[in-house]
């Protein structure tokens, strides 16, 4: 019998302002078993992003709200513990929407990618080499196509994407104007 416990952070109530600890609950659940085509991942790093404020709201925006009683949605980096998919093997490090929990069973197709082969810390897959960093990189360099000496104005420069855009613009030789706050 599996003695492991899956600690999960679940959304208990919807905040009307800034989320606080009282809006969440920690639940101990059994570690789930993967079915065919699925992978059991043990989370190592969880992402905490500004977008989560919208996810705990009752109002749908670009994605559905997290349901009350559900595990908090989150990108994570984890280690494959068990695999019922030929695409992933135990010991590999992967990233995906695994949630705030110790273990997640996910469809192999929902795993974004294998990480850890670059020699950089695997946590960078949630930051500069993850969704936010790649969004900044491609938005600025492929769409913006800045040239040295130009001025780059970065709104929301204190955010995850904006802070990366500002740094990339500086590297490219731009005069960077960062806007943060009201």
Identify the residue ranges that each predicted region occupies:
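Adenosine-nucleotide cofactor-binding segment
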Residues: 170-182
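Short structural boundary motif marking the start of a folded domain
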Residues: 2-9
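Short N-terminal binding/cap micro-motifs at the start of the first secondary-structure element
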Residues: 15-21, 50
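Short glycine/threonine/proline-enriched tight-turn/helix- or strand-capping micro-motif at secondary-structure
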Residues: 19-30, 59
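NAD(P)H dinucleotide-binding glycine-rich loop of Rossmann-like/cofactor-binding domains
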Residues: 72-79, 90-156
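Glycine-rich beta-strand-centered segment in the early N-terminal region that forms part
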Residues: 30-48, 56-100
